[in-house]
From Swiss-Prot:
UniProt organism field: Synechococcus sp. (strain CC9605)
Family statement: Belongs to the aerobic coproporphyrinogen-III oxidase family.
Protein name listed in UniProt: Oxygen-dependent coproporphyrinogen-III oxidase
Function in brief: Involved in the heme and chlorophyll biosynthesis. Catalyzes the aerobic oxidative decarboxylation of propionate groups of rings A and B of coproporphyrinogen-III to yield the vinyl groups in protoporphyrinogen-IX.
Catalysed conversion reaction: coproporphyrinogen III + O2 + 2 H(+) = protoporphyrinogen IX + 2 CO2 + 2 H2O
Residues reported to bind a divalent metal cation: 122, 132, 166, 196
Domain of life the protein comes from: Bacteria
Listed HAMAP family: Coprogen_oxidas (MF_00333)
Record-annotated active site: 132
PROSITE patterns given in the database record: COPROGEN_OXIDASE
Coiled-coil zones: none
NCBIfam families assigned: PRK05330.1
GO cellular component: cytoplasm
Molecular function as annotated in GO: coproporphyrinogen oxidase activity; metal ion binding; protein homodimerization activity
Length: 362
């Protein structure tokens, strides 16, 4: 029924005025997208259990009354990970929430389907960064799109870690199209930004949303920002459904090679109360972003999603300190001054000179 509706809507003469994709998705689009994100959840969980060595994910399946469900997998008190979760969800409904209609008003009145996998890991050792991942697919009548990304949030600065994470995801993007990373990297800096703090959430990675067969790559909310400017300079870059499917698959599979070497390098490093206190303080920024700015959290709550799964991204322990200022010249100051601001991690050689005096390169 939905696909015949798509064809009827696309056949209307006013479609050219809308933002609806000109390309219909494959007839098995939902099944393939579901299988892809479920497969990523399985692969990532297996890899993380091997990386931790002791912790195991506990799975809880859930059903959404309005349609759909998912499986939440949570690891607690592992050797490496204090807490981490990897979710899969598949939900559908009749009425779209305001957060979606604001971006894609042409989807109004159509039954919708969304599936995705999301992950957040909070390591115990402050020298190991927190990491987040999300890959998703959405359909509603004439509208479909892919979205996703991965970003790294260090608590102590190591230039090599930031470069490795970015380099690995750049290669995954380049495997689909060489222009993608040029837009998705600054888009990540833009999205994971705490406006009330004037900080990025971390060193970024990649982020993309509303990717269909139309127009330019950037479909964000800042038409004058760096991502929009790069996208405009590139012109139209329409990607097919198959290319966008491959993009999510390639970057999802790149996660373990991007993150596991960082964990293996940092986990043996000794730390004390100072480092732990700073980690808990910086985790506060993570909580602030997820509860105030994150569109995924807002979408989940507006669609009556499973609250425990939506808030799984929050760290188990966190602290706030009024008026905190890092000691001048400290590693903590370097993190807040350099690693919470957008940087050209792969192209700016001057970053080495700023990090070297602090032992913050490798």
């Amino acid at each position: 029924m939905v696909r015949s509706l798509i064809r009827r809507v696309l056949g209307r003469q006013d479609v050219g005025v809308s933002n609806a994709p000109l390309e219909l998705p494959p007839s098995d689009s939902r099944e393939r997208a579901r299988a892809m994100v479920m497969g990523l959840q399985d692969q990532i969980c297996a890899g993380l259990e091997a990386l931790d060595g002791e912790g195991r994910f506990v799975e809880e399946s859930w059903v959404r009354h309005e349609g759909g469900g998912g499986r939440s997998r949570v690891m607690r008190e592992g050797r490496v990970f204090e807490q981490g979760g990897v979710n899969f969800s598949e939900v559908q409904g009749e009425e779209l929430p305001p957060s979606i209609l604001k971006q894609r008003p042409e989807a109004k009145g159509h039954p919708w389907f969304a599936t995705g996998t999301s992950m957040v890991l909070h390591p115990r050792n402050p020298y190991i960064p927190t990491v987040h991942l999300n890959y998703r697919y959405f359909e509603a009548g004439p509208v479909w799109w892919f979205g996703g990304g991965a970003d790294l949030t260090p608590y102590y600065p190591f230039l090599d870690d930031a470069r490795h994470f970015h380099r690995t995801h750049q290669a995954a993007c380049d495997s689909v199209h060489p222009d993608l990373h040029k837009v998705f990297k600054p888009w990540c800096d833009e999205y994971f930004y705490l406006k009330h703090r004037g900080e990025t959430r971390g060193v970024g990675g990649i982020f993309y949303d509303y990717q269909d067969a139309n127009g330019t790559l950037y479909k964000g909310q800042d038409p004058s920002g760096p991502a929009a400017q790069v996208s405009a300079s590139l012109g139209a870059r329409p990607l097919s459904w198959e290319q966008l499917f491959s993009l999510g698959q390639a970057n999802g599979r790149a996660f373990l090679p991007a993150y596991a070497p960082i964990v293996e390098k940092r986990h043996p490093m000794a730390y004390g109360d100072r480092e732990r206190d700073f980690q808990l303080y910086r985790r506060g920024r993570y909580v602030e972003f997820n509860l105030v700015w994150d569109r995924g959290t807002i979408f989940g709550l507006q669609t009556n999603g499973r609250t425990e799964s939506i808030l799984m991204s929050l760290p188990p322990l966190v602290r706030w300190e009024y008026g905190y200022t890092a000691e001048a010249g400290s590693r903590e100051a370097l993190l807040t001054e350099l690693f919470t601001k957008p940087q050209d991690w792969l192209g700016d050689a001057s970053l080495d000179e700023r990090c070297r005096p602090h032992g913050a390169i490798n």
